[in-house]
Amino acid sequence: MVRSCLSIVLSAGEGTRMKSPLPKVLHKIAGLPLICHVLKQIELAESSQVAVVVGCGGQEVTHVVQSFVKDVMIFEQKERLGTAHAVLSARFALQKGVDDILIVFGDTPLIQQESLHQMRAQLADGADVVFAGFHTQDPTGYGRLLEKNGQLIAIVEEKDASEEEKKISFCNGGILAMRGKHALSLLEKVDNNNMKKEYYLTDIASLASREGLDVRVVEVPFENIVGINNCLELSRADSLWQKRKARDLMLSGVTLLKPETVYFSYDTEIEPGVVIEPNVYFGLGVKVQSGAVIRAFSYLEGAVVGQDAQIGPYARLRPGTELAKSVKVGNFCEVKQAKVGESSKINHLSYIGDAEIGAHTNIGAGTITCNYDGFNKYKTVIGDHAFVGSNTALVSPLVIGDGSYVASGSVITENIPMNSMAFGRARQVIKEGYATKFRARLLEKNLSENKQKK
């Protein structure tokens, strides 16, 4: 029998240590807001219902969450009175009678579905309450997990821990799972008899233990539950995410020559057999097919790179770029909102924007599509087996037919029929011996000007 599950994401914290007007959970790792990383893993853990508790920046957080997850419930914690109080802000959702309750924090972007599945498995096995825990050589600052006979009996915050308890290296990971039938009753028994006068979610451990409930701990890797409180921790978490992504790609058959220098986005898709050189950036929406080579210092976003294509070095692919099989885009080229056909080449110093290029076409060095008049964008269409010479300006809207040649240095403003040759430049004029006369004239002029100054 499939167990129903309500996941509650706590994201009401003010995040003052981020020192940013942006709500903490909307800061990004790999191009995706922190809270969306959490929501993604919750979905993979087969949550049937999702609730998000918002506070500071609630409207912004709500907008992002609702655009990322369908049918999400939003609740506001109007007063910051602790984590248990935050969960009770979602009382309406807690009353729906689900089998499992998962409670996670919106600033833990490295959480993994496997950990959530493990905690739910403990509930299915008979546990009433399950906390996530982790071992660390330096437990300073973390709540300690106190166990007895294999059961969790309490979570003691460091400021309240005895010297003996401070030696415990098993710490609270911040994720909580409960049977739905116990959730409200336990939460309502949490009091605020502490220095901060707040209602702590961790008190549920001792409350449940005293009631004779089955309280367990699932050990998870520390990196899976890392929380974000400032921009330094954000950077460290991003680095952990990047290492994880690079490892997964290399194990799948992708060659990364210097993985620590490559930056991936959360939705980057790279097929086996791809080779990626150092210092490459993958923005949102990039797909790279097998056999492609992405050379050093290239920047890709919103682009599809076809099989056996070669990109870079120093190439930029912008959103809307679609490169077919064996396309070459070389150094200092920028391609935007353009489709490039099989085996076509854009090898040097070119800008191709709002264009469609056929197969087996060569775009010479310094070619520019002039696609913008200050108000509107216009399209350039170049057929199959065409040749565009170096230092050419293509003023769109423009169609260049199959098999046509464009002479180097041309400014092309009119359509070119197929198998034609177009020249769009002034004829070269040679005046033999004129350079000597020209230099003499310039020298005479300079001497005259110098005399006038004196």
Swiss-Prot record:
Its main location: cytoplasm. GO terms for cellular component: cytoplasm; membrane. Its cofactor is Mg(2+). One of its GO terms (molecular function) is magnesium ion binding. The keyword Acyltransferase applies. Catalyzes the last two sequential reactions in the de novo biosynthetic pathway for UDP-N-acetylglucosamine (UDP-GlcNAc). The C-terminal domain catalyzes the transfer of acetyl group from acetyl coenzyme A to glucosamine-1-phosphate (GlcN-1-P) to produce N-acetylglucosamine-1-phosphate (GlcNAc-1-P), which is converted into UDP-GlcNAc by the transfer of uridine 5-monophosphate (from uridine 5-triphosphate), a reaction catalyzed by the N-terminal domain. In the N-terminal section; belongs to the N-acetylglucosamine-1-phosphate uridyltransferase family. HAMAP family: GlmU. This is Bifunctional protein GlmU.
